Amino acid sequence: MALLPDKEKLLRNFLRCANWEEKYLYIIELGQRLPELRDEDKSPQNSIQGCQSQVWIVMRQNAQGIIELQGDSDAAIVKGLIAVVFILYDQMTPQDIVNFDVRPWFEKMALTQHLTPSRSQGLEAMIRAIRAKAAALS
């Protein structure tokens, strides 16, 4: 996650974009910064149902109890949305993830109102899947 900004910098950078085209390009750029997901991690158990695009999210807990997320998608904008979600959940324990509400951050970014309904549903599916996996670990 070192290549990605923290939550506050994400919000600042997003709000600096002059228009929605710039914001979409920034989201795509964030997705390009995600580390490559191994082919063996692109498996059915890591696949997120409810997304129009193919999405894989891998969740591992490190020795300190912090969740490490990895993900990929076959769509550039969706891969960027994965990066945004990962930034919001960065350095959290499973219980932190379960308790943390990402929606106020999306509202500050005015993100969801500029996504198509299918992208918004996919974003919600990613969040539900991450929270469910975190709940199983907590």
From Swiss-Prot:
Xref: InterPro entries: Cysteine_desulfuration_SufE, Fe-S_metab-assoc_dom
GO cellular component: cytoplasm
GO biological process: iron-sulfur cluster assembly; sulfur compound metabolic process
Subcellular location: Cytoplasm
Pathway: Cofactor biosynthesis; iron-sulfur cluster biosynthesis
Keywords, ordered alphabetically: Cytoplasm
Keyword Cytoplasm recorded: yes
Xref: Pfam families: SufE
Record-annotated active site: C51 (cysteine persulfide intermediate)
Cytoplasm keyword on record: yes
Oligomer and partners: Homodimer. Interacts with SufS.
Entry's family note: Belongs to the SufE family.
Protein function: Participates in cysteine desulfuration mediated by SufS. Cysteine desulfuration mobilizes sulfur from L-cysteine to yield L-alanine and constitutes an essential step in sulfur metabolism for biosynthesis of a variety of sulfur-containing biomolecules. Functions as a sulfur acceptor for SufS, by mediating the direct transfer of the sulfur atom from the S-sulfanylcysteine of SufS, an intermediate product of cysteine desulfuration process.
Protein name: Cysteine desulfuration protein SufE
Gene: sufE
